[in-house]
Amino acid sequence: MRHRVKTKKLNRYASHRKALLNNLARSVFESESIITTTAKAKAVRPLVERIITKAKEANSTDLPERRVALNRDINKHFNDRKLVYKIVHEIAPRYENRNGGYTRILKIGYRKGDASELSILQLLPKEE
């Protein structure tokens, strides 16, 4: 029985799934919008939201050791300091007054080859 099982397996073993989600999250932060299957978009969305929340906390904290710890926590997903800098200093400040809901999933139809449902996962623009 699958009671209380949160994660979708996406027909992959654990390390493959972890790599897939980290790569999708990286793509979202680099280009701010990706086209992928709906199932993958729904699977990566919580990871992206959690990372943005950590980046917001890193910006708002006064303790330098806490800021370093949060930056390292974000870095463990990507292992790319430039990307962490972009997330913490460019993306997170956009959502300073927003409590969650930093992304949206727009369904765009079906893939021609295998009829998989495709979606756009994008970061929301800054509120005016």
UniProtKB/Swiss-Prot annotation:
The keyword Coiled coil does not apply. Pfam families: Ribosomal_L17. InterPro entries: Ribosomal_bL17 (IPR000456), Ribosomal_bL17_CS (IPR047859), Ribosomal_bL17_sf (IPR036373). PROSITE patterns: RIBOSOMAL_L17. GO terms for cellular component: cytosolic large ribosomal subunit. Belongs to the bacterial ribosomal protein bL17 family. This is Large ribosomal subunit protein bL17. It comes from Petrotoga mobilis (strain DSM 10674 / SJ95). The gene is rplQ.
